[in-house]
């Protein structure tokens, strides 16, 4: 029984020794890696083979799904002394083996131009029958903070509150904002309130000493970006003078409007008065005599000339020869005169005949000027 027990122990030790000296992955170090987008990463997978590993060498890198119910995605494969690097379309052209001949013991994988979508768990699996070994890496691709934008909000007067803001559009959380002063004594105002999460700094009851240049840094675990802002605290303006000036301007404007309205009303009243005077003048002037009626009166007088010769000279009035060199229109267009007309002088009939006068009969007329 003692010899049999000793034989079994020796056999067991030999088997354990052979197993320990078989296929092994010798890479060490962190299995959780954080990288910034745009960088490259090397997932190390060094291995050694045992003398009894006689089967074909197969190397496979795969992306483990976050959900256990999903299948893993094969990324890159080495089999039959050939490398196949186009299995996974999202990493196509950006992934390859670190060694041109992985069978020499280097199955490490390089990923170029990292993206945030490359985040995941990657597994290196090496198989050479009867040996099998694997190693996993948790890769986290983080986005650097984008260039932050600094701004100042609030009144820049002494005794007022001002808020300095800093914000990055892109960047993987957690991300914090740090404010510092780069001018003067480089110390923040004593009443400054910082918020590292939102990136705001409130300057309460600001004084002239708070004026200067301030810098904000946006940072996370993979990068840092910054921006600056100038702050100038001044004395508040004289509001009483501004109010007085506004009131004076309003009064001047009202006076100007009143003058314009007064001038318009005066001009309108004057024009209306002139029209009324013109209407009164036209009503006082009698209408001119008709030329047709005057011509008819001369015609009737001429037709009766022959019968006037037998009338006695005492019944005749003198008749002077009309002057034809004057324009008749002037006589008709001339307004009537209000001066009294002197009575015509009487002369004897024989004297009138010697003077060449022609006796005419003047028909009687009524008040409106018509012949009776």
UniProtKB/Swiss-Prot annotation:
The keyword Membrane applies. Gene3D superfamilies: Immunoglobulins (2.60.40.10). Glycans are attached at residue 205. GO terms for biological process: homotypic cell-cell adhesion; kidney development. Residues 23-140, 130-234 form the Ig-like C2-type domain. The keyword Cell membrane applies. Residues 286-352 are annotated as: Disordered. Its main location: membrane. Keywords: Cell adhesion, Cell junction, Cell membrane, Disulfide bond, Glycoprotein, Immunoglobulin domain, Membrane, Receptor, Repeat, Signal, Tight junction, Transmembrane, Transmembrane helix. Disulfide bonds join 45-124, 150-227, 166-216. It is a single-pass type I membrane protein. Residues 263-372 are cytoplasmic. Residues 1-22 form the signal peptide. May function as a homophilic cell adhesion molecule and be essential for tight junction integrity. May also be involved in transepithelial migration of leukocytes through adhesive interactions with jaml. The interaction between both receptors may also mediate the activation of gamma-delta T-cells, a subpopulation of T-cells residing in epithelia and involved in tissue homeostasis and repair. This is Coxsackievirus and adenovirus receptor homolog. It comes from Danio rerio. The lineage of its organism: Eukaryota, Metazoa, Chordata, Craniata, Vertebrata.
